[in-house]
Amino acid sequence: MYIIIAGIGRVGYTLAKSLSEKGHDIVLIDIDKDICKKASAEIDALVINGDCTKIKTLEDAGIEDADMYIAVTGKEEVNLMSSLLAKSYGINKTIARISEIEYKDVFERLGVDVVVSPELIAANYIEKLIERPGILDLAIVGRGEAEILEFIIPEKAKVVNKKIKELGRPQDYLIIAIYDGDELKIPSGDTELKSGDRVLVLVKKDAADAIRKMFLEE
């Protein structure tokens, strides 16, 4: 995939490095010459020193051929303007970073496909872990309508030694994976839950607390 990333801060740098290592064609844009020089030496990407709100800069980056445009500079107005410019070239997907969550609806109404806030994501993640005692990790999916919970089944939990099909027909959750030691298994209805199993469950947001209790409480 051909991806243009505007802004070589912490988010842009990390994202570009990860995507380039996975074989994507990356173009980086930043207005700071020293930052561009450093990124050029460390990331397998075309690095352009320029203003991403200028048409010439975007065209130099090959905006006409890009599959995705990601604006993660530290300035929301720059991210919005450059994303809308990219959109005018018919690009398939634009992603823009914001810091103030109240701008999210505005960005989306104006045509930015995906609006993200690293600060808000981090805050939500910590809040969810606090709200879900016993959960090792979680991921918010489906535009916030669902979560993937990761937990270890306690020794005296009610589900220990039960087969998944014995838990009843799931309405609001799905067990998607179980770690038996270091081995990842995709479970079936006949899979037996054991004490110490590390389990990943996809669950509707509103049912997350009830499902957590079902698997963890004695």
UniProtKB/Swiss-Prot annotation:
It comes from Methanocaldococcus jannaschii (strain ATCC 43067 / DSM 2661 / JAL-1 / JCM 10045 / NBRC 100440). GO terms for cellular component: plasma membrane. Part of a potassium transport system. It holds the Pfam family TrkA_C. Residues 136-217 form the RCK C-terminal domain. Keywords: Ion transport, NAD, Potassium, Potassium transport, Transport. GO terms for molecular function: potassium ion transmembrane transporter activity. The keyword Ion transport applies. This is Trk system potassium uptake protein TrkA homolog. NAD(+) binds at residues 7-11, 30, 51, 73-74, 97. The RCK N-terminal domain binds NAD and possibly other effectors. This is expected to cause a conformation change that regulates potassium transport. It comes from the Archaea. Homotetramer. Dimer of dimers. Residues 1-116 form the RCK N-terminal domain. Gene3D superfamilies: NAD(P)-binding Rossmann-like Domain (3.40.50.720), Regulator of K+ conductance, C-terminal domain (3.30.70.1450).
